[in-house]
Amino acid sequence: MKKTDRIWELDALRGLCILCVILIHLIFDLIYFIGLDLYLPAWYVFVQQYGGVIFVVLSGCCATLGSRSFRRGCIVFSCGMLISLVTFGMYRLGMASRDVIVWFGVLHLLGVCMMLYPVYKKLPTQALAAVGVALVVTGYLISGTVVEAKFLFPFGFVYEGFTSSDFFPILPHLGWYMLGTVLGRTVYADKKTDRKSVV
């Protein structure tokens, strides 16, 4: 997709999601690190609960419009690992409690989703939608399942005492990402926006 053919509504929605994430983390930092007793507006709870899913769906939609998904996924996942390293360092240095560590956040998730996209991108749209729904349902069914193994948390299986200040497990979120790619295939099949709708 050429730079001049960017889909404005997707850029606007992603920008809004990023702005909301920044505000969410700012409020969290003011409460957690500075100790301010702040009133949490209604939109805070909404964004905290649903903003991540919306952003993942949008990212899946955008995956159908670009290229080099695997390479970009590696970069995004590396950024997620850097955040894990920094937050773990903050804990080890006594700057914050263990709860601040990001073990598998949104950047880890998006990186994995982007790297996996070339594997399933050739699936028929209906099959992709079915797999996406199945992963979403499975993810919510296993949500909060406690297991003894400590290496399954990226898939949503947590161990006793597990905490992560930002947690986006592969299940159900890979399913939401796939449904986003279905949205991209259907709504933006020609990889451009309908400019007449905003004139």
Locate the predicted segments by residue.
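Alpha-helical transmembrane segments and their immediate juxtamembrane cytosolic regions
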Residues: 1-199
